Amino acid sequence: MKVRPSVKPICPKCKIIRRKKRVMVICENPKHKQRQG
């Protein structure tokens, strides 16, 4: 899980979702998991 100020999809399978007012990226590749912090 990477915590960064701006989250962007890295590959075509990355999906941007909102959980508990947090913007997150979920993907099949675990390296692409991101969260806005």
UniProtKB/Swiss-Prot annotation:
One of its GO terms (cellular component) is ribosome. It comes from the Bacteria. GO terms for biological process: translation. InterPro entries: Ribosomal_bL36, Ribosomal_bL36_sp. Keywords: Ribonucleoprotein, Ribosomal protein. It holds the Pfam family Ribosomal_L36. GO terms for molecular function: structural constituent of ribosome. Belongs to the bacterial ribosomal protein bL36 family. HAMAP family: Ribosomal_bL36 (MF_00251). This is Large ribosomal subunit protein bL36. It comes from Hydrogenobaculum sp. (strain Y04AAS1).
